[in-house]
Amino acid sequence: MPPPAEVTDPSHAPAVLHQLNEQRLRGLFCDVTLIAGDTKFPAHRSVLAASSPFFREALLASAPLPLPPVTGGSAPSPATTTAASSSSSSPPPASPHSSSPPRVLELPGVPAAAFSDVLNFIYSARLALPGGGGDGAAVAEIGALGRRLGISRLQGLGEGGDTWVPPAPTSMVTSDPTEDGLGAGPRTDGEWVGDKAEALTPDSQPRRPFPCPRCGKSFIHPKRLQTHEAQCRRGSNTRGSAGLGPGVSGSGGPAGVDASALPQPVGFRDGPEHVVKVVGGHVLYVCAACERSYVTLSSLKRHSNVHSWRRKYPCRYCEKVFALAEYRTKHEVWHTGERRYQCIFCWDTFVTYYNLKTHQRAFHGISPGLLASEKTPNGGYKPRLNTLKLYRLLPMRAAKRPYKTYSQGAPEAPLSPSLHTPAPAAMPASPQPLPPPAPEPGPPPSVITFAHPAPSVIVHGSSSSGAAGGGPAGTGGSQAASVITYTTPPRPPKKREYPPPPPEPTATPTSPASTAVSPATAAGPATATEEAKGRNLRAGRTLTYTAKPVGGLSGSGGSPTGTGRGSSQLQAPPPLCQITVRIGEEAIVKRRISETDLRPGELSGEEVEESEEEEEEEEEEDQEEQEESKAGGEDQLWRPYYSYKPKRKAGATAGGASGVSGLPRGRRPPRWRQKLERRGWEETPSVEGPGGRGRGERRHRCGDCAQAFATVRKLRKHQEAHSGGSHTSRTGRRSSTRFTCPHCAKVCKTAAALNRHGQRHAVERPGGTPTPVIAYSKGSIGTRPTDVKEEAPQEMQVSSSSGEAGSGSAAAAEASESASLQDPVISGGEEPPVAGGGSYVYPPVQEFPLALIGGSREPSAGKGKPGNEGSLGASEGDRMEGMGTAKVTFYPEPYPLVYGPQLLAAYPYNFSNLAALPVALNMVLPDEKGGGALPFLPGVFGYAVNPQAAPPTPPPPLPLPVSPKGIGGMTGVERTQKGDVG
């Protein structure tokens, strides 16, 4: 029988090796990553195992399935070998409990440059010595690495130059490379060390992927392995069972093989030792490398990875490896460009915290650094204990899971295919296996949570609609460092509120997490109540921070600049946000501004009554928030320069009450103009709304002053002013002084605000009805409204004559239509309306006039006493110049004064201190005893006359009786003009 013909190709083996090297360089079919130093090297496990016994043992130790056991004698028979090899070559059935082998193999203490040369030699069988072989240190380093890896051709390089690596065993490497690489030909006993070791390893349970290199104990999670390694203090001569079984020892191995000469298993080097110190009764763990102290041992272990070679977190996009996971996360952001830092005011996202901080300082007027630190006595800053994060850290998209997982530290059970494969829409709903139920220690969360913690999450606790999609879903976490809660009491939803932000990509409808939102909607305010019970709430001090929007209020579609992302897609700015921080508690996010205030346009089709009620609620809430910020002024670290109400421009008042003529078409007038239009006083015709009821109609009248109001809320607020401010204020707020407008139901907090508000009433009637002037006469005590005379509008004019001239000037007062000089002129009031069309009942007329300032003509009016020269002003001085000697008369007996709102409203001054008013009006200044003159009334109280009013028209002076002592001197108003008024 002729021998069989054979076909050989000497170039086949080099060609296959060349193709494998090309695949390695391109990253094709690489199933393991080798980490040497800070560099990653992709490779093929089969090539590494065929080239180096070190890699063969290491990869067998981390194989997912053990080799079949060998029964019988010390050496296997050829039949057993063939069966074992055939069974190992065939793919075994996948076990549900077997975990995938680790794809990362770390080489501690191996320099990256030397390992790169060795890996190139494995794949190409060529090695270019550094420096042409003249660099002895580099050659010795490669030789030491070759001895450690067991590569026979590299063991002789630089022999004796390095003693830190044990010599590789020569008996385990065959001379024929085809026997080890291709698996053909006779095998030596040394090649069965790994198989024998695997046979002695118990394989009743699945192999755990994280074994301890010292004691051999395996763990499921790498964190548990790190905790165990810190406590494991066995000797360095103890061999671990990670790579070899317990049967491999000095005498249990094959003949001629020393256990100490075997390559070291893959593991971690010993980390730096730590020092325990006790300082002030507290235990501190000090790092031996950098002497940094930590409170807990786990923090020190986490820090020790920086000093050791435990770089187990390789970048998924480049060749860098990091010691800590957060270092890798911060690095990978620059590859992916993810914007994880989200502003809680405008929901804009940024790549880094620095960009977010710059955005909040520039566009919202908020400095986050002031919230996280406080000043020290020596002028520095120290971190706060209870800091408020004004941002949310969103999870990474690459690491985000569509549903919450429940890890109990045991091998994970096989997940049902229905959780991995989305169900098509055409398939009918069928019961699917769900993960085990989550523990329920408290109320269910209203946002979809993930398995990893998040530093900040918004939990909607008071609004049921916010749970179903009001907040950004998918940004929460199972554990939150700072929780921002909606703890305001629930109120009926408004139709014109700003729409909720678009939710971020969340779970599929088939995931069980989507069903976790529905029970939160029924929780309602109970969620916030349950959360508040365990947080030790207290009514303490508050800090209010107001953030302005990113864009302007024009609503022209202009995109905000400088936000960092493509914000030009937003056609209108997001709503404003005000945050009230209670000391020691969470933040309360209040969005007070409705959509129509930020997006000018036409009104929607809602009812007029609802819109009025909404704006009244918003106005009341704005006033309460401003009171709260003023009451806690001493606690406020900073005040933003933005206010909710826009400032009126200089030309905004030219349009009158309507205010629509000067605005471009398609834009609504400002909010304060709309309120003035809707109020609709009685002299302006009522505007019919969509509901048929006039906006200007006032149905509720006050029983005390018969003033009409459009709503019951305004009437109650007005009645509280009559009762002396007996309304109950909120707990923890200071009582504020109320200043009620006499023309409408507006209640101001300060006198200056009331003065500015009063100017609006004067503005909306340009050249309108003259201001009625009420004049009371001494002789007409019993007169009623029929004796009231209306005069030309004027700001204020107080003039008088002596008491004897009261009856003599009656005829002159009737003949002239100007103001009477013998009676006080009280201007600025308005006759209040009366229900039922009846006449208004006036208060009783005073028996004596107010402080009267009179003057008479005298020939010698130019003389005066020295030291009394002064200046009253150009207009007032010229008016009083021709009046001659003047005199101020006060009455000694006190008389009943009516200084309520009716009298005070007549004066154009702001009487903030009412207690001093009756005392000033009852001051006595006898005529005959030569007392000092009373200063002019504005000089006494320091009240400023309304600057916008027209200067008063001086009436023609009437002859007054001459004072007995007024022949050669100046009295009365002249002395007042000269010296008493500054």
Swiss-Prot record:
Per the record, the covalent cross-link Glycyl lysine isopeptide (Lys-Gly) (interchain with G-Cter in SUMO2) lies at K40, K548, K590
Give the highest taxon in the source lineage.
Eukaryota
Quote the InterPro entries the UniProt record gives: BTB/POZ_dom, SKP1/BTB/POZ_sf, Znf_C2H2_sf, Znf_C2H2_type, ZnFinger_BTB_dom_contain
- Annotated SMART domains: BTB, ZnF_C2H2
Kindly provide the PTM information from the record: Phosphorylated by HIPK2. This phosphorylation reduces stability and triggers ZBTB4 protein degradation in response to DNA damage.
For bias type Basic and acidic residues, the affected ranges are 591-600, 628-637
| Name used for this protein in its record | Zinc finger and BTB domain-containing protein 4
Q: Which organism does this sequence originate in?
A: Mus musculus
Cite the source lineage.
Eukaryota, Metazoa, Chordata, Craniata, Vertebrata
- What gene name is listed for this protein? Zbtb4
